[in-house]
Amino acid sequence: MNLSWLPSMLQTTDPLFPIGSYAHSYGMEELCADGEISNREDLQTFLHTVVALNLQEFELPYLRFAYEAAKRQDYDLICDLDEEIGASKPSKELRQASLSQGQQRLRLISKLRPSPRFEELAKLKREKRIVPQHLIIFATENVDLNTPLPAALAAWAYQAMAAPCAASLKLIRIGQEGAQTALTNALERLEPIIEHSLGIDREFAGAFLPYLDIASQRHEKAYSRLFIS
């Protein structure tokens, strides 16, 4: 069994990997301020509904499209996907969160593990053909590592579920054990989410989440805040 991809994938999905993800709550801070999320049960509901739906219907399908495009080195398609991902984020904060993490990930992995794929993405960025979106860089990186697609999907989904749990420690009275309990319950439901996402075609990919979009837009104007988004 060839697991040469695994150590590097673990490194770049670890919270220690400095792309700034710790500074974002992705709209959750405003939901906590409004009282929508105030305890572990509320957090679990948020993970099982909003986060799960966004993963299943939008992020995981687009991660698969980007992974397959990077594998074929179809950079025209990568440009199209990058634009579509950005257009799907009506909130300025969410767009900027994806942009900043995508740029930082590309900059860092290009230094740590130089690759023609990363050079091409940097060229597309200079030409302003891509932003690049974080998801695009993550997909291309895992193609370059020879990470199997299911593992890449699971790693992205884990990050999406873990981020609100990490933010919750600063936003509500939950504690480390409560946050880990919520995360464990969410992770137990990941497999069917990933399986379902594999059957979604590009023309049907997308999630309508005004609840989160409105919270993120309100967060932009908040009087005080802990997180960038």
Tell what function each PLM region has.
Residues V143, A155-S229:
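C-terminal auxiliary extensions adjacent to catalytic cores
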Residues M9-P18, L47-L53, A87-L94, A122-K128, ...:
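A short glycine/serine-rich beta->alpha loop
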Residues G35, L47, V51-L55, Y67-D74, ...:
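Structural signal for hydrophobic packing residues in well-ordered secondary-structure cores
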Residues L60, F65, R72-V143:
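Internal, conserved structured core segments that host functional sites
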Residues W5, M9-Q73:
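Glycine/small-residue-rich interface belts in oligomeric ring/scaffold proteins
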